[in-house]
Amino acid sequence: MNHCELEEVTQHINNKISMIKRLLELRAVAKDPDKRGTLLKIGQEVSAINELLDRFEKYVGKQRDLLKHLKDLEGFFQEDEQDAYHLKNNTPPHMPKRGQQAAPQGGGQVAVQSRQTDAPAAPQEQGPPRKTQRNQIKEMEFITVPEFDSIPPYMKGRVTYDQLNAAVQSINTAVTSKYKILHQPVKTLNNVSRSLQQRFKDQETKDTKGHFFVVEQDIKEFAQLKVDKRFVGMLNMLRHCQRLKEVRGGGLTRFILL
């Protein structure tokens, strides 16, 4: 037995001796009738303190569980916050902004107000007011994420989801610009617009009757977009997603909206 172990044994024996002395003193006090009541009162208070300590221990355990639950909630909130920042910084450009009306589903019909002449309005006494003619222009619906994922990789290449929907927006711009001119009365058009309107009519065939379509020249002029090999690939993807079909004839390829 080394020196440290001997000191520990000595200290333990001394503690036991001190405890025995204290018990003997308390035993002598307990035999005194005057002090026995005080000892009983102290024992009751010690029991009450033990019960209170038990309650505190249970309360601390509940608070510990609550703290763990709050930390878990904090982790969930942090994940939601990160997701919100990700959505804010990666919102597709074709998504409508606050205060803008989203593009309608089921064919994407957009009302276009026909241009009125600068002639002064006739007085109400001369007859009922003339009704304003409204024409509906079809717009291509944007590609959804599941549709984009369904495109074969060999067809998709490096084109991203946002780039494909940007092409959809460009085609819609060309379609809207074309049919705004096409729906105007001839007398309200200038020479340039009149020539364009005649060109649009000459490009129509029996296959395009009742459909909205554009040609490559329309996309170049109205969308200010270069129809290169990459854009042609995106047209193939839109055809795969059943957004358009091609009709050839007369040296032109007509892209008909479905």
From Swiss-Prot:
Q: Does the keyword Cell cycle apply?
A: yes
Q: What is this protein called?
A: SKA complex subunit 1
Q: Which InterPro entries match?
A: SKA1, SKA1_MBD_sf
Classify the source by domain of life: Eukaryota
What is the documented function of this protein?
Component of the SKA complex, a microtubule plus end-binding complex of the outer kinetochore that stabilizes spindle microtubule-kinetochore attachments, promotes alignment of chromosomes at the mitotic spindle equator (chromosome congression) and assists suppression of the spindle assembly checkpoint. Kinetochores, consisting of a centromere-associated inner segment and a microtubule-contacting outer segment, play a crucial role in chromosome segregation by mediating the physical connection between centromeric DNA and spindle microtubules.
Listed under GO cellular component are:
cytoplasm; meiotic spindle; mitotic spindle; outer kinetochore; spindle microtubule
Mostly located where?
cytoplasm
Q: What keyword terms does UniProt attach to this protein?
A: Cell cycle, Cell division, Centromere, Chromosome, Coiled coil, Cytoplasm, Cytoskeleton, Kinetochore, Microtubule, Mitosis
Q: Which residues form a coiled coil?
A: 5-25
An example of a GO molecular function for this protein is:
microtubule binding
Gene Ontology BP terms = attachment of mitotic spindle microtubules to kinetochore; cell division; chromosome segregation; mitotic cell cycle; mitotic metaphase chromosome alignment; mitotic sister chromatid segregation; regulation of microtubule polymerization or depolymerization
Where in or outside the cell it occurs: the entry states: Cytoplasm, Cytoskeleton, Spindle; Chromosome, Centromere, Kinetochore
Could you tell me which residues belong to the region Microtubule binding? 137-258
Q: What's the family?
A: Belongs to the SKA1 family.
Complexes and interactors? Component of the SKA complex, composed of ska1, ska2 and ska3.
Q: Where is this region: Disordered?
A: 86-136
Gene of this entry? ska1
The organism is Danio rerio
